[in-house]
Regions:
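Soluble non-cytosolic domains of exported or imported proteins
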Residues: 29-33, 49, 95-99
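Active-site phosphate/ATP/adenylate-binding loop shared across adenylate-forming ligases
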Residues: 12
Length: 124
């Protein structure tokens, strides 16, 4: 009987450890996906405001392609989503000489819509 209890306890520990590891890995992928979406949104909004902006030579996106665990398909889906949706978060400055890119990208980054899209994309 003690043998069965010991085996059952070991199974519970293994399953718990496995679930925890999977959650950590998923969380890292989720954060990478959100980071890439933020990069893509900043680049998209800067191109909208000024096509000669220095941000257009920012190679941060390459980090996500080369060093993250995101697949190329996931990156492409995120980029397409950002290009289609991020301008919905565009805010207009009260000062006509300025813009609100940082605030607009922050709103997009923190949106439930982006979170939901990324969750759906990573689960496919």
């Amino acid at each position: 009987m003690k043998h069965i209890q010991m085996i059952a306890m070991m199974c519970v520990i293994c399953v718990t450890a496995s679930c925890t590891t999977q959650k950590v890995a998923y969380r890292e992928r989720f954060e990478d996906a959100k980071g890439y979406a933020l990069y893509a949104c900043i680049a998209h909004m800067n191109k909208f405001v000024d096509s000669t902006s220095f941000i257009n030579i920012d190679y941060s996106g390459e980090y996500f392609v080369q060093l993250s665990s995101l697949s190329l398909e996931e990156i492409i889906r995120i980029k397409e989503y950002v290009d289609k949706e991020c301008m919905n978060y565009w805010s207009i400055s009260q000062n006509p000489e300025g813009n609100m890119i940082a605030y607009s990208t922050w709103k997009f980054y923190n949106s439930k819509d982006l979170d939901n899209f990324i969750h759906k994309t990573l689960r496919k």
